[in-house]
Amino acid sequence: MKKQNSSYAQLRIGFYEIRFQNQTIQELVYEFNQLANSHGWTAERSYFSMALMNEIIRRDINVSAIVVQDDKNGLVVSIHYNPVRYDEVSKSLVTFS
């Protein structure tokens, strides 16, 4: 994990890089790493997306968007948070098929 500033953390899991845009989420990095290992997220992108979203829903994290992009280093998942309730922003979640 590299810290760019007090409100940014990132975790690289194989080809996947997960960026946490809220400093209160940084303590989840280790747990996400364990979850990724147990679910084999490096194998199937659609499964990766589903497992990630299920974990976010389970924790009732306030998410404004999940943005998934490919780059030359692999898959980049950016998770954006805001202070509204999850059910108010669930329609803005962006995933891939």
Which residues does each predicted region cover?
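Extended, charge-rich alpha-helical interface modules
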Residues: 2-97
